[in-house]
Amino acid sequence: MKKRISNINRKTRETSISLSLDLDGSGKGAISTGIGFFDHMLDLLAKHALFDLEINASGDTDVDYHHTVEDVGICLGQAVKEALGDKAGITRFANVSVPMQETLADIAIDISGRSA
C-alpha cells in the first residue's frame, strides 16, 4: 500500500506554516501555532483520528488569530487531499455525532472535491 503522507509549506504576508501529515500514523501530534486552545484541538484531532500531525505555524497573532487559524485549515485540507491520492477504497461522504467531554460534536464530511 502506498504511504499516505503529505508535507505542506505555506508562506503569506501574515503567516508561515509547515505541516506534515501521516494518515496511517498512531495519533502523535506535535503542534505549535502560538494559539494554545487551537494547538490543543489539533492535538486531539490527531490523537482520535490516529494520524500523525506536525504543525509549526507563526502568524500575526498580535493582530488577530484568524489568519493563522484560516491558513492552518487551508494547509490541513491540502495535506489530507494530497495524502489520500486517488481516494481508492475511500467512502466519499460520512457523518457522525460524538459526545466528548462536555460537548456534542456533529460532523459531516464529503471528500468528492466538488466546490460547495
Describe the predicted segments one by one.
Residues M1-A116:
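Structural preference for solvent-exposed beta-strand-turn elements
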